[in-house]
């Protein structure tokens, strides 16, 4: 009788171990697809030891203009997890992929978020980016039942939270303590900085670009309050080009990271270093 009980206990124990192993490997060594670099950076920070992470976009394409084919969507729908931004066209891809594979796991990094001018402010604002990171952490926790793996992700999130919070503090301090609190840009993307107390004059080529706004910038240049114009690319609009040429201004290009690789040029660069450099570039005008 004792032998039978012993065998039953052993059988039950093996069953439990098998169940645990299945749970642990369910979200281990998986294939994850993302879209742009800011999402890719977070998932790698939190989960790179347990997954291979890819972008649905080919390297170097314009993610705003590129459209995924049905064949590619079918291919990506067979992956384990798709991490997307529901405030971008990613949402349409997520819907199509789920329709192709109802078992596909998905995480929306933009849950509960919104933007006012441009989608880039979701990650160029460290405060917003921290929300994206938290959404991703919580999304992973919904799929992972291994408590040790959840704890590992939470620990990595705390490290990332510290780094992003430090960026937010540095940006806040840079603007709060600045002698000059006005910048001129060629894009509304930079308007998120108004929440930090900065006056942003956007010369984006649209219906809001008035003669009065251009004259305001010219007066600020005469008063030596403006020395730089901030852009998202090296190519800017005609109005800004003329202002730069006529007034000997310097154009500063800010990396918005809205691409598959974040416009990274060397292996030492990442979201943290790029944002640190962006803040330092901003200081050139604020502390001239």
Predicted regions mapped to residue ranges:
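Sec-dependent N-terminal signal peptides of Gram-positive bacterial secreted proteins and lipoproteins
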Residues: 2-23
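Extracytoplasmic metal-acquisition and chelation regions
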Residues: 19-288
């Amino acid at each position: 009788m004792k032998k039978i009980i012993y065998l039953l206990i052993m059988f039950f124990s093996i069953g439990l171990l098998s169940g645990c192993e299945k749970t642990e490997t369910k979200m281990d060594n998986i294939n994850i697809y993302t879209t742009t670099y800011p999402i890719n950076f977070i998932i790698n920070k939190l989960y790179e030891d347990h997954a291979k992470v890819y972008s649905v976009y080919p390297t170097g394409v314009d993610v705003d203009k590129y459209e995924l084919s049905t064949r590619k969507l079918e291919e990506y729908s067979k992956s384990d997890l798709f991490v997307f931004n529901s405030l971008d066209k990613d949402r349409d891809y997520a819907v199509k992929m789920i329709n192709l594979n109802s078992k596909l796991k998905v995480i929306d990094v933009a849950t509960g978020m919104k933007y006012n001018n441009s989608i880039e402010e979701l990650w160029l604002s460290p405060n917003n980016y921290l929300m994206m990171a938290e959404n991703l952490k919580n999304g992973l926790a919904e799929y992972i039942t291994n408590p040790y793996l959840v704890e590992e992700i939470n620990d990595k999130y705390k490290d990332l939270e510290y780094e992003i919070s430090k960026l937010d503090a540095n940006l806040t301090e840079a603007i709060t303590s600045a002698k000059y609190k006005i910048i001129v840009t060629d894009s509304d993307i930079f308007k998120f900085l108004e929440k930090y107390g900065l006056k942003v004059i956007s010369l984006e080529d649209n219906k809001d670009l008035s003669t009065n706004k251009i004259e305001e910038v010219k007066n600020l240049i005469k008063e030596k309050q403006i020395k730089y114009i901030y852009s998202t690319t090296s190519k800017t609009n005609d109005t800004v080009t003329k202002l730069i040429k006529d007034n000997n201004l310097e154009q500063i290009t800010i990396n918005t990271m809205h691409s598959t690789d974040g416009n990274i040029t060397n292996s030492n660069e990442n979201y943290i270093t790029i944002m640190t450099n962006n803040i330092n570039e901003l200081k050139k005008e604020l502390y001239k």
